[in-house]
């Protein structure tokens, strides 16, 4: 019986060392060697080298001179510690009322936008932290951004087109635009908005309220 116990103990210790120490160290080492940026959280820095967020976690931009992301049901909105969807079903009256309110707000804030309001801008993602928009949804907001920044619409559209990411490996997903990276590109191209600049809701330059 004692030999059986020793065998079990040795097996337990070896397994703990392999799976709890050596394997995590090997994976961490390879990740740091091959793709250190992604392994460390895909941090995004501004022009002064300050970390302003992660490329993987959306932020709730609301100022008129920035592109806005999808609505978020994560905490008070884009709370990285409270990732979740709304859990409202297609027959939910609350969902219908919220979508109607979003539609009204978006039409009011984007009077020069061409075409109907994109569905993305009135629906939350499953995680509540989606950092991307479709290129079409970003372009729909371009007129508001151009007006708020006092630049030509074509110049803002050029920034959007330059930030479009293609399908992963050429086949997975759809073309998309990272909202945080897009707004940082706006600041690099046209300069950051002054802190006192009027906003739609009054918040959020890149990094303000960053996760």
UniProtKB/Swiss-Prot annotation:
Keyword match Flavoprotein: no
Matching Pfam families: KdpC
Membrane topology: Single-pass membrane protein
Keywords: ATP-binding, Cell membrane, Ion transport, Membrane, Nucleotide-binding, Potassium, Potassium transport, Transmembrane, Transmembrane helix, Transport
Superkingdom per UniProt: Bacteria
InterPro entries, per database record: KdpC
Transmembrane portions of the chain: 13-35
GO cellular component: plasma membrane
Primary location recorded for the protein, binned into one broad class: membrane
Localization per record: Cell membrane
Family: Belongs to the KdpC family.
Biological role: Part of the high-affinity ATP-driven potassium transport (or Kdp) system, which catalyzes the hydrolysis of ATP coupled with the electrogenic transport of potassium into the cytoplasm. This subunit acts as a catalytic chaperone that increases the ATP-binding affinity of the ATP-hydrolyzing subunit KdpB by the formation of a transient KdpB/KdpC/ATP ternary complex.
Subunit structure: The system is composed of three essential subunits: KdpA, KdpB and KdpC.
Protein's recorded name: Potassium-transporting ATPase KdpC subunit
Provenance organism: Myxococcus xanthus
């Amino acid at each position: 019986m004692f030999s059986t116990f020793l065998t079990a103990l040795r097996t337990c210790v070896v397994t703990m060392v392999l799976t709890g120490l050596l394997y995590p160290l090997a994976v961490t080492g390879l990740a740091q060697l091959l793709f250190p940026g992604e392994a460390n959280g895909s941090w995004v820095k501004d022009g002064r080298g300050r970390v302003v967020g992660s490329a993987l976690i959306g932020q709730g931009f609301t100022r008129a001179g920035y592109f806005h992301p999808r609505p978020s049901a994560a905490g008070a909105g884009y709370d990285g510690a409270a990732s979740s969807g709304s859990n409202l079903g297609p027959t939910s009256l609350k969902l219908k009322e919220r979508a109607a309110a979003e539609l009204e707000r978006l039409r009011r804030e984007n009077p020069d936008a061409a075409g109907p309001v994109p569905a993305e801008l009135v629906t939350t993602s499953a995680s509540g932290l989606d950092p991307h928009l479709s290129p079409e949804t970003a372009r729909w907001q371009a007129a508001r951004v151009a007006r708020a920044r006092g630049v030509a619409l074509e110049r803002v559209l050029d920034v959007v087109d330059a930030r479009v990411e293609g399908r992963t490996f050429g086949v997975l997903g759809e073309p998309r635009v990272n909202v945080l990276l897009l707004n940082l590109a706006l600041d690099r191209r046209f300069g950051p908005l002054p802190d006192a600049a009027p906003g739609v809701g009054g918040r959020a330059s890149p990094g303000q309220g960053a996760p």
